[in-house]
Design a protein with these regions (language model features):
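Charged alpha-helical initiation segments
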Residues: 1-11, 24-28
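A short acidic (Asp/Glu
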Residues: 22-25, 37
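Long, charged low-complexity segments
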Residues: 29-127
Length: 127
């Protein structure tokens, strides 16, 4: 994929991931600022280890990957920042040196969404 293809979709996907994790953190009584997905997720894991592990397992069960969850998370941690400022030569160089595999973010966002949906829409488990 060329770095400029589907930039809006990639930025929105990364931003959704950030907002969903921040929502989980907020529901756990923690406020956090910043765009680094890895930092946000690790903060959530320290508070809700079991739920975070379930989400990670859900993500990995949907991916065929040669990398661990942590490696993929680390690789995609700055996607929002890098793609949002794509016109910046430094960001473009970063994207070229570290190409995105968007399937991880797609699956991660969906898994977090499912977790939030269970907590917010159907907290008692009855659908």
């Amino acid at each position: 994929m060329r770095p400029y293809q589907n930039v809006a979709g990639i930025v929105n996907l990364a931003f959704a991931c950030e907002l969903f994790i921040k929502c989980l953190l907020n529901m756990s009584g923690i406020e956090h600022k910043g765009h680094k997905i890895e930092k946000l997720w690790n903060e959530y894991k320290t508070v809700c280890e079991n739920e975070a592990s379930e989400i990670e397992a859900s993500v990995m069960s949907r991916l065929v990957a040669d990398f661990t969850f942590g490696e993929m998370l680390h690789n995609d941690s700055d996607v929002f920042y890098n793609y949002r400022y794509l016109y910046d030569p430094e960001r473009l160089a970063e994207i070229r040196n570290n190409p995105l595999k968007p399937q991880f973010l797609r699956v991660f966002v969906f898994a977090i969404y499912q977790s939030l949906n269970e907590k917010l829409i159907c907290p008692d488990g009855i659908v």
